[in-house]
Amino acid sequence: MMDFNSSSSISCQVSALIDAGLQKRQAEQRPRSYLGASRLGVSCERALQYEFAKAPVDPGREHPGRLLRIFERGHLSEESMIQWMRQAGFDLRTTKPNGEQFGFAALDGRLAGHIDGVIVGGPDGFKYPALWENKCLGSKSWRDLEKNKLAISKPIYHAQVVLYQAYLELHENPAIFTAVNADSMEIYTELVPFDAALAQRMSDRALKVISATDAGELLARAYQDPTHFECRMCSWQDRCWRQINDGR
């Protein structure tokens, strides 16, 4: 029997109900049929290949409700930033006239991405049009970004930005990247110049992952030790290292 006098019991119950609802919604969503540009910067091509091929994650590695709530926080933060940017005088466009999100598709639609927005005008000191991308980060991650800048601190996000700049032909002006500190609500902004070499490497990587998957070839793992931090955090750690018995 539930103890209604216990705040911890009530908290656990409500959290569990919310998480179940979020997990149900996620399960009902149609899975991507393409390789997302937002993921191409991950360190391990094999993990990226598992993700693209929709390989089942290891038992117990499904996204917990708490992580889904963090994802939801990011969406809500983005909506707030859109309003704040517009109130600050930026002419920020986030959808086409028909309501669809701006994006691109390449490689017969098997590589695709959707951007947060395009800023077509606004205050002095910026060049327009400019790609706009926004993230919501915990304080530790945000501080690291502030200290080391996007390319070093968040290489996945950096790859995402330059790919969008390339495929949407927004490469002539620096992207405007913003990040909200979820704890303090501080806002970090960085002007991100186009990196043609990185965009080409990421585009080549997409083709490599798609081609290898079509051919049934398993790409090399990025690390040689299953206890490496990246491997321990990977949703396919067990699946990947079981392959070693097959000489792969």
Task: Cite the ranges covered by each PLM segment.
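Metal-dependent nuclease catalytic cores that hydrolyze phosphodiester bonds in DNA/RNA
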Residues: 1-131, 138-140, 151
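Metal-dependent nuclease catalytic regions and adjoining charged, substrate-binding loops involved
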Residues: 5-6, 144-158, 163-248
